[in-house]
């Protein structure tokens, strides 16, 4: 499983700055979808060869009301379930009572915690950080998140034990190179074959009390009983095998499948980290939304994360029965307005309690998975690229036309198209979006994001041992060029 890093600390110590720096390599993917909220509290990071989930738990006051009451339940859950906690402090402000209250809470939890003294730029860092040793959480690490100083070393130190335990490999890539990595055609082919031999992993996610457990029980059959309060189920999602119409599935249940008597509980413990890990591990994500409440910011945040990791999407609007027609029209209008950035995802209106519309969900799940894993040949992708250029030529860059040469598959789930050419790194985002939409229409991709990446064509003469002209050869060359110009006149 991918490691989870939680950022903890009082307000204004630099958590958001560090969060943005860690996740910035993925922001461009979200920017391709206008209308998606950018105010995210969790995201996927890729730094120095490590991939991990980072969660900003929000600021904690540590006032006299007590830390337990001041922290949101989800922030507490994030600390409980994270693999690593980075406890940020302000080196310029020094040690505060709020810092001590947070440290006391973390000591009681016995979490793997690293104290980070942020904002050490422009001050005597060693003397400023000395007092933070009194927190009793071990070594104090210096960082200037705004400038990026100490960030990479901190992450490497914090994640190395987890990387070794989970078999993650360090490839030594820097931030830029890691994000630009492309699958070769051979790797993409192998990935596609691997996916064909595995069951479809379907993660059912959503806010508390939208009917995830009811829907899961409806899919599995009411007679299926899985005990929720077993050891281990509080941290990890439950993986349930299922066969339907000859297709094998694995349902990843983030809410926990309750006994029938408990399905209608009014309060459900929601775990952000459990949900994010389920999205990471899934092939297709089924987002359940309550028709009576509509799309919430939390839903948009989950959708943004699913897009970032390239998962296929299906949306189920639950509790559709018993709503007046005018309310239904209003809900549909809101969905069109707020979900325009994922117009490729199928939306189903269902009643998990009564089973209405549930069967059709699997048609969209299979369609999305087929789109995400369908093999497309290099010749087909190159032909579509040429058709797109005929419809809309690439722009001029410094007086020269950007030249696109050929395209091939770079990966699956999500489908990745790699286009090779000259000056492609200078292409404007508008043209990149045009190419992405052109491929989506041409390939009839439905239910999954599609990524188009551009790779600079190599210089075939680079590295050749070209000899420098002698003085006499240089003179002869000039005479020949002059002669050619005279003839043209």
From Swiss-Prot:
Binding-site list for GTP 2: 206-213, 253-257, 318-321
Binding site for GTP 1: 9-16, 56-60, 118-121
GO BP terms: ribosome biogenesis
Pfam families on file: KH_dom-like, MMR_HSR1
Gene Ontology MF: a single term: ribosome binding
InterPro entries: G_ENGA, GTP-bd, GTPase_Der, KH_dom-like, KH_dom-like_a/b, P-loop_NTPase, Small_GTP-bd
Gene3D superfamilies per UniProt: 3.30.300.20, P-loop containing nucleotide triphosphate hydrolases
Keyword Repeat attributed: yes
Keywords: GTP-binding, Nucleotide-binding, Repeat, Ribosome biogenesis
Domain KH-like residue range list: 374-458
Domain EngA-type G: 3-166, 200-373
Disulfide bonds: none
Domain of life: Bacteria
Subunit (UniProt): Associates with the 50S ribosomal subunit.
Function per UniProt: GTPase that plays an essential role in the late steps of ribosome biogenesis.
Family membership noted in the UniProt record: Belongs to the TRAFAC class TrmE-Era-EngA-EngB-Septin-like GTPase superfamily. EngA (Der) GTPase family.
Listed name of the protein: GTPase Der
Organism this protein belongs to: Shewanella loihica (strain ATCC BAA-1088 / PV-4)
Gene name tied to this protein: der
